[in-house]
């Protein structure tokens, strides 16, 4: 597999500014992610004393998996005080989208580089956000149909949308297998298809909860790298978190004030507010099989779906004795994660790291230091067919990754068109606009006639526009093979107006290039970069 790094002219300059140590951006975080001294400081930080208990919890969580020797060793390293590189994500259908795998590769790559540089073991940890309840975000994925040159949405359907946390959701296995079958119908048959389908079927048969199936697929893929997994909703982990839940409840107003102040500061720097929440407690409570947002009205803590209320002593008592009923929101999850782990760096996506920029004062309030916040690696897979099509039409890969292919497609069509025809139609449009202005001058002051002239002009312009569009459409239809190839480029490299990794599913790559494509023996060794990585399997 070939691997190269390209620099893109990104529309969003947040990550390039992190790369260049822009003082406005670095001032939003505790550490400058582009400076080696930041890593030296984090590597030398004193541990919090929770590492042995945390290692036991992770071992228990992964007890339904057959651990690799690398994972066994990393659990031991964690118990002995090794620091971690961590990142997480919701449990997407069939492991998707691709950027989840890329986030794990980011964690693996950075932890290895730190281990090699500092001669201290750094453990890769992936945090499954099983406490989330927005099932609409994880119940679907996309598959690319090569025959049609188009993407198709594949969705797991359920009669009732679960309102509990994703970790508490148990999908219908028959329906899930039907969803899997639908996905594979769209994918081309390869020598890897049957083996991959058997792996997925076995996972569905062997595991029951949505997040356990997700965990099993990730484990199958990344166990050889020694990656450790933990679900935020795992009950033994929640019991460890009880002291912090109590602190959050006691300081909820100060926490909310700190968050709002930091968010306002980021907006004053010209950034858009990322975290949208009305709560002033920033916790959820599981009640009546629903994950309910907690808010405080000045006298009581109130649940948003059942309107159940608690006085402070009651809700703190729940946190102490039944912490598994609580879960964090986007504000408190990073805080809880860092309170638990001895983290060198947190790996986040482009939007995620902007969330963290709004939390600096929250960390300081609880005397928890924000770790180095690193943008994850961004990766695109380029196969031989798409590379040949790009070459055929002389289209730069970097341009497609940023802007898509529509501009190049339009340019191609116009080059095939009669320039005289287009010029004459455009000339007629310009002539009509001049005529319209002359007529308006003639009827100035008479609103009825002004309306009549403008309406007449609108009809003429629409007719000329229609003529030009239909003429170009006819050229498209006469060149349907080329149009399909442009569509292939778009759906492969810039699907739905964004990067491939945000839409494509990992099963597509596994099916095309083999079930071992992500394994250490096959996948190219990566170096951490803020730029874009192109991999040619």
From Swiss-Prot:
Coiled-coil annotated spans: 422-450
Enzyme class name: ligase
Assigned EC number: 6.-.-.-
Protein's UniProt keywords contain Coiled coil: yes
InterPro entries assigned: Bacillithiol_biosynth_BshC, CC_BshC, Rossmann-like_BshC
GO molecular function: ligase activity
Keywords of the record: Coiled coil, Ligase
Source superkingdom: Bacteria
Protein family membership: Belongs to the BshC family.
Function recorded in the entry: Involved in bacillithiol (BSH) biosynthesis. May catalyze the last step of the pathway, the addition of cysteine to glucosamine malate (GlcN-Mal) to generate BSH.
Name the UniProt record assigns to this protein: Putative cysteine ligase BshC
Species this protein is from: Staphylococcus aureus (strain bovine RF122 / ET3-1)
Gene encoding the protein: bshC
């Amino acid at each position: 597999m070939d691997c190269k790094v390209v620099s893109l002219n990104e529309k969003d300059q947040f990550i390039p500014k992190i790369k260049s140590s822009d003082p406005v951006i670095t001032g939003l975080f505790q550490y400058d992610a582009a400076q080696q001294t930041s890593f030296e400081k984090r590597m030398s930080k004193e541990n919090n004393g929770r590492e042995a208990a945390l290692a036991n919890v992770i071992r228990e969580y992964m007890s339904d998996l057959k651990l690799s020797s690398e994972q066994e060793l990393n659990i031991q390293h964690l118990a002995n005080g090794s620091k971690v590189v961590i990142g997480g994500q919701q449990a997407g259908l069939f492991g998707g989208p691709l950027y989840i795998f890329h986030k794990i590769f980011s964690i693996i790559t950075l932890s290895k580089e730190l281990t090699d540089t500092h001669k201290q073991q750094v453990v890769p940890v992936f945090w499954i956000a099983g406490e989330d309840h927005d099932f609409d975000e994880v119940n679907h994925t996309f598959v690319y149909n090569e025959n049609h040159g188009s993407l198709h949405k594949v969705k797991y359907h359920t009669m009732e949308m679960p309102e509990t946390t994703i970790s508490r959701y148990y999908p219908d296995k028959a329906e899930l297998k039907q969803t899997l079958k639908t996905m594979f119908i769209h994918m081309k048959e390869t020598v890897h298809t049957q083996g991959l389908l058997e792996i997925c079927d076995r996972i569905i048969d062997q595991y029951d909860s949505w997040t356990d199936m997700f965990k099993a697929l990730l484990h199958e893929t990344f166990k050889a790298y020694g990656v450790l997994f933990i679900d935020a909703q795992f009950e033994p982990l929640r019991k460890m978190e009880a002291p912090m839940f109590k602190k959050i409840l006691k300081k909820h107003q100060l926490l909310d004030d700190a968050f709002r102040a930091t968010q306002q500061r980021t907006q004053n720097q010209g950034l858009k507010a990322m975290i949208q929440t009305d709560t002033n407690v920033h916790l959820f409570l599981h009640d009546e099989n629903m994950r309910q947002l907690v808010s405080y009205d000045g006298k009581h803590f109130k649940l948003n779906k059942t309107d159940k209320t608690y006085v402070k002593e009651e809700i703190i008592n729940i946190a102490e004795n039944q912490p598994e009923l609580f879960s964090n929101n986007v504000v408190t999850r990073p805080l809880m994660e860092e309170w638990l782990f001895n983290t060198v760096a947190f790996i986040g996506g482009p939007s995620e790291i902007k969330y963290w920029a709004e939390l600096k004062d929250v960390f300081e309030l609880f005397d928890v230091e924000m770790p180095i916040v690193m943008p994850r690696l961004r990766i695109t897979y380029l196969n031989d067919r798409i590379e040949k099509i790009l070459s055929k039409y002389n289209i730069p890969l970097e341009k497609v990754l940023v802007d898509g292919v529509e501009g190049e497609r339009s340019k191609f069509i116009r080059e095939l068109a009669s320039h005289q025809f287009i010029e004459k139609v455009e000339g007629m449009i310009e002539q009509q606009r001049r005529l319209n202005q002359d007529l308006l001058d003639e009827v100035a002051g008479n609103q009825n006639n002004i309306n009549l002239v403008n309406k007449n002009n609108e009809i003429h312009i629409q007719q000329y526009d229609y003529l030009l569009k239909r003429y170009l459409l006819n050229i498209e239809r006469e060149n349907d093979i080329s149009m399909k190839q442009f569509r292939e480029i778009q759906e492969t490299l810039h699907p739905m107006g964004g990067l491939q990794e945000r839409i494509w599913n990992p099963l597509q790559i596994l099916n095309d290039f083999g079930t071992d494509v992500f394994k250490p023996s096959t996948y190219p060794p990566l170096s951490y970069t803020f730029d874009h990585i192109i991999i040619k399997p």
